[in-house]
Amino acid sequence: MAKGKDNRGKVTLECTGCVQNRVNNKKKKKSAGIYRYLTQKNPKNTPSPLELRKFCPYCNKHTIHGEIKE
C-alpha cells in the first residue's frame, strides 16, 4: 500500500536546439516554434534539473530537452 500522498510534480521539458536556433536566427528568419514535453518527476529522488534526449519535430531530430521553471 502507498504511504502518504504522492509528491510527484509536473515538469516541462523544452528543446534546447529550438531555443538556440531562435536566439541565433532572431533577425534572419522566424523559427516554427519551441517544442515542449510534459512529464512528472519526484523531487526527493532527483533534485537536479531533468534532461532527456527526445525527438523534436521542429528540429526534425533527437535533441536534449531540459527542465524549465514554470
Curated annotation (Swiss-Prot):
PROSITE patterns: RIBOSOMAL_L33. It holds the Pfam family Ribosomal_L33. GO terms for biological process: translation. Coiled coil: none annotated. Its main location: plastid. The keyword DNA repair does not apply. GO terms for molecular function: structural constituent of ribosome. Keywords: Chloroplast, Plastid, Ribonucleoprotein, Ribosomal protein. GO terms for cellular component: chloroplast; ribonucleoprotein complex; ribosome. It comes from the Eukaryota. InterPro entries: Ribosomal_bL33, Ribosomal_bL33_CS, Ribosomal_bL33_sf, Ribosomal_zn-bd. The keyword Chloroplast applies. Transmembrane segments: none annotated. It is found in: Plastid, Chloroplast. HAMAP family: Ribosomal_bL33. Belongs to the bacterial ribosomal protein bL33 family. This is Large ribosomal subunit protein bL33c.
